[in-house]
């Protein structure tokens, strides 16, 4: 046996007991509201096209696939859950493992627990209120505040993110000592994300959760564009005590528009030298068949448990981090 083997869990046992209590509380929250718990696959023949997400890939070589079938570990259960919604399942939630081949650190582990739920007939604001209710129940925190993406930039960086050009964004980046990154970045949305991460996030959600809504339309992902202001998407995120907790959408239901967005993502991936990803045609077929008007959100459970315990790192709240797996 290796003398360097680390068999012990990364989280203390009392923390795992608290984690179990949080998971039970989450399930109780949705059961009390009549939301169905579902399970969907951890692997799929298609994956996300988002240029900022990196999935794990494997190959199935079982019966009927001697040449190998490419499969991807799911970065979230979103696509399968939307197929259930299109089939008429009604409001649903899921607690599941998700996988991202990205960073590892205080707030990240390649394998993590996701809470995702969808509400037919909910707009973005009604879902924000439900996320707020859940956080108050689980974390016993104050009611959240809400700021638009534009308001957050204007308050903390004194710039309008919806109208500023790349030169103006680089000027703000210089004030944050980020010129070494910003000066060579040509993608406007990447510049905005850099400024948001370094110049806005540290100042929000300190005493109570903060919802940021109406992200730029160019960052819509799978969200609808606002009918009142076509510059913004009906997308929101929530932050608390320096941690991003959730990302939600008033979901796009137009299959043609969704295909165009996937294709645009793949063009961006090609321009950056990243592999183009297979588009999920099953999802597009579900949208074509009729996804009900709905809003949905994905929330990082491990991070919620961190906040419930006052933990400093994700390793304190999961049994085995990847370096001990």
Swiss-Prot record:
Which reaction is the catalytic activity of this chain? D-beta-lysine + L-lysyl-[protein] + ATP = N(6)-((3R)-3,6-diaminohexanoyl)-L-lysyl-[protein] + AMP + diphosphate + H(+)
Alphabetically sorted, this entry's keywords are: ATP-binding, Ligase, Nucleotide-binding
Which residue ranges does UniProt annotate as crossing the membrane?
Answer: none
Residues engaged in binding substrate: 76-78, 118, 251
Q: Which GO terms describe its cellular component?
A: cytosol
Q: Which cysteines are joined by disulfide bonds?
A: none
**GO annotation terms (biological process):** lysyl-tRNA aminoacylation
Q: Which GO terms describe its molecular function?
A: acid-ammonia (or amide) ligase activity; ATP binding; lysine-tRNA ligase activity; tRNA binding
Q: What Enzyme Commission number(s) apply to this enzyme? A: 6.3.2.-
Q: Which residues bind ATP?
A: 100-102, 109, 244-245, 300
Subunit record text: Homodimer.
Q: What does this protein do?
A: With EpmB is involved in the beta-lysylation step of the post-translational modification of translation elongation factor P (EF-P). Catalyzes the ATP-dependent activation of (R)-beta-lysine produced by EpmB, forming a lysyl-adenylate, from which the beta-lysyl moiety is then transferred to the epsilon-amino group of a conserved specific lysine residue in EF-P.
UniProt similarity note: Belongs to the class-II aminoacyl-tRNA synthetase family. EpmA subfamily.
Q: What is the name attached to this protein's record?
A: Elongation factor P--(R)-beta-lysine ligase
**Name of the gene:** epmA
């Amino acid at each position: 046996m290796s003398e360097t083997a680390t068999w012990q869990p990364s989280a203390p046992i009392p923390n795992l007991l608290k984690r179990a209590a949080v998971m039970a509380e989450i399930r109780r929250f949705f059961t009390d509201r009549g939301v169905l718990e579902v399970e969907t696959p951890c692997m799929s023949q298609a994956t996300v096209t988002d240029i900022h997400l990196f999935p794990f890939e494997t190959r199935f070589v079982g019966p009927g696939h001697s040449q190998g079938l490419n499969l991807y570990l799911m970065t979230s259960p979103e696509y399968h859950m939307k197929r259930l919604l299109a089939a008429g399942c009604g409001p649903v939630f899921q607690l599941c493992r998700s996988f991202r081949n990205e960073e590892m650190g205080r707030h990240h582990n390649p394998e993590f627990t996701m809470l995702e739920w969808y509400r037919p007939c909910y707009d973005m604001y009604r879902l924000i209120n439900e996320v707020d209710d859940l956080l108050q129940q689980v974390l016993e925190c104050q009611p959240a505040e809400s700021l638009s993406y534009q308001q957050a930039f204007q308050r903390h960086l004194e710039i309008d993110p919806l109208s500023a050009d790349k030169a103006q964004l680089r000027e703000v980046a210089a004030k944050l000592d980020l010129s070494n990154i910003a000066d060579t970045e040509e993608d406007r949305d990447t510049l905005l994300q850099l400024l948001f991460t370094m110049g806005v996030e540290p100042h929000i959600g300190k005493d109570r959760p903060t919802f940021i809504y109406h992200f730029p339309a160019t960052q819509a992902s799978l969200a609808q564009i606002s009918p009142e202001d076509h510059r913004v998407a009906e997308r929101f995120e929530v932050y608390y005590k320096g941690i991003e907790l959730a990302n939600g959408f008033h979901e796009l239901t137009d299959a043609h528009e969704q295909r165009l967005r996937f294709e645009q993502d793949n063009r961006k991936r090609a321009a950056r030298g990243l592999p183009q990803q297979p588009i999920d045609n099953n999802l597009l077929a579900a949208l074509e068949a009729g996804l009900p008007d709905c809003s949905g959100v994905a929330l990082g459970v491990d991070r919620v448990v961190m906040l419930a315990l006052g933990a400093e790192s994700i390793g304190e709240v999961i049994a085995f981090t990847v370096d001990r797996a």
